[in-house]
């Protein structure tokens, strides 16, 4: 679409000129990010947890990555669909620092399938299911690009501030916070006994630090970045690999299209 391409080109050129004319103040950008991380409602969705070996690791959620871009300034990040056919979608995720001209991009092929118990793959036919799968995978890749461009000390500080905000809470008694957390897990099919087994003690002994960790686990399961079986005793949920291990290896578009041509031939 020539008009769309022209519009995007003009928009990018305008953004580059603006970035050169109004460079970011790193101190102000950092302060804005820290201020956002002080909001309890945001902190509650800003991190997620995933299993890595025998450990549980926390990281920035997709929402936190988006806030980093918004507040760090003079950056463009997004996802662009390149091709969708033969039961798969090829798309590009990217993040570009307009001031330094540093960019990170990934081109991925996402098959329209889901993995069932036992390892078999089920093709998706419902357009809504396909859209949700592609959108979710695209958002994850965009997050990866953002975190590759935003300085790591900034993203680490944001995660730490969000954890601090969650730990402090809003003045609500910790007993009420524990009950609310149990209710959230119940909605995912995780009962109180399962949570207690993971914690290694009765639910009423849960500490503020453990509540923060449970928030990350809840966010990961809810966003389908992890399975219940990764953290709790769910025989029907096969444990999944960490997000990095689940991601297919990035390839350039030329290689992907060559692969497709070879298959057709």
Question: Model regions: which residues?
Answer:
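Short, small-residue-biased leader/transition segments that mark boundaries at the very start
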Residues: 1-6
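Hydrophobic-cavity lipid-handling domains and compact docking modules
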Residues: 34-120
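Mixed-charge, glycine-accented linear interaction segment located at domain edges/termini
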Residues: 219-223
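Single-stranded nucleic-acid nicking/binding segments centered on His-rich, glycine/basic loops
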Residues: 147-205, 212-214, 227-258
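Intrinsically disordered, compositionally biased tail regions
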Residues: 257-265
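Glycine-rich and polybasic anion-binding loops at the starts of cofactor/ligand-binding domains
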Residues: 8-12, 94, 101-179
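Structural motif
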Residues: 124-126, 205, 209
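TRNA-recognition modules of translation machinery and tRNA-sensing kinases, especially anticodon-binding
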Residues: 17-18, 24, 31-34
């Amino acid at each position: 679409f020539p008009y769309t391409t022209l519009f995007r080109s003009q928009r990018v050129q305008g953004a580059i000129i603006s970035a050169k004319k109004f460079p970011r103040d790193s101190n102000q950008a950092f302060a804005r990010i820290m201020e956002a991380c002080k909001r309890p409602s945001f902190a509650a969705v800003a991190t997620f947890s995933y299993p890595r070996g025998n450990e549980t690791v926390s990281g920035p959620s997709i929402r936190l990555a988006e806030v980093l871009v918004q507040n760090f300034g003079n950056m463009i990040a997004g996802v662009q669909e390149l091709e969708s056919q033969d039961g798969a979608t090829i798309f590009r995720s990217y993040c570009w620092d307009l001031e330094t001209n540093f960019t990170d991009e990934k081109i991925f092929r996402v098959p329209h399938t889901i993995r069932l118990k036992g390892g078999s793959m089920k093709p998706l036919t419902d357009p809504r299911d396909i859209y949700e799968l592609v959108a979710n995978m695209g958002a994850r890749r965009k997050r990866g690009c953002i975190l590759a461009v935003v300085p790591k000390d900034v993203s680490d500080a944001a995660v730490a501030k969000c954890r601090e905000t969650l730990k402090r809470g809003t003045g609500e008694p910790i007993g009420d916070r524990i009950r609310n957390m149990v209710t959230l897990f119940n909605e995912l099919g995780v009962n109180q006994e399962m949570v207690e087994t993971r914690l290694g003690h009765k639910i009423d002994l849960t500490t503020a630090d453990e509540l923060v960790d449970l928030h990350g686990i809840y966010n990961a399961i809810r966003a389908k970045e992890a399975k219940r079986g990764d953290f709790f005793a769910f025989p029907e949920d096969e444990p999944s690999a960490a997000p990095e291990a689940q991601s297919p290896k990035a390839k350039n578009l030329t290689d992907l299209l060559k692969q497709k041509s070879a298959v057709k031939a």
